[in-house]
Amino acid sequence: MNTLLLLAALSSQITFNTTQQGDVYTIIPEVTLTQSCLCRVQILSLREGSSGQSQTKQEKTLSLPANQPIALTKLSLNISPDDRVKIVVTVSDGQSLHLSQQWPPSSEKS
């Protein structure tokens, strides 16, 4: 097995399942953990466009099982071409586990 694939399989991670219909994006952040935990989940959504700025923040504590992808929430956003949007998902057990991932990835236009 490729070393990179093996490392990905052995590490906890946050991923985003994204679909788009016109200007409407549906974004589902998922977390997969190597060990189960009682984790604090924070989802921060920032948006800036011609109509102004908005920021929303969701926080909750979840009991997350190991080795299976868990959908954390479902976001549906109407994003115009001139809008700048950033979603940051953080999962932490307050000790050794701290994951954070941004959508869109910094290599994409936001």
Swiss-Prot record:
Primary subcellular site in the record, as a coarse category: periplasm
GO cellular component: periplasmic space
Transmembrane segment boundaries: none
Highest taxon in the source lineage: Bacteria
InterPro entries referenced in this protein's UniProt entry, alphabetically: Curli_assembly_CsgC/AgfC, Curli_production_prot_CsgC
A Pfam family it matches: Tafi-CsgC
Residues of the signal peptide: 1-8
Triggers of expression: Under control of the CsgD transcription factor, part of the csgBAC/ymdA operon.
Subcellular location(s) per record: Periplasm
Similarity comment text for this entry: Belongs to the CsgC/AgfC family.
Protein name (record): Curli assembly protein CsgC
Top-level taxonomy: Bacteria, Pseudomonadati, Pseudomonadota, Gammaproteobacteria, Enterobacterales
Gene: csgC
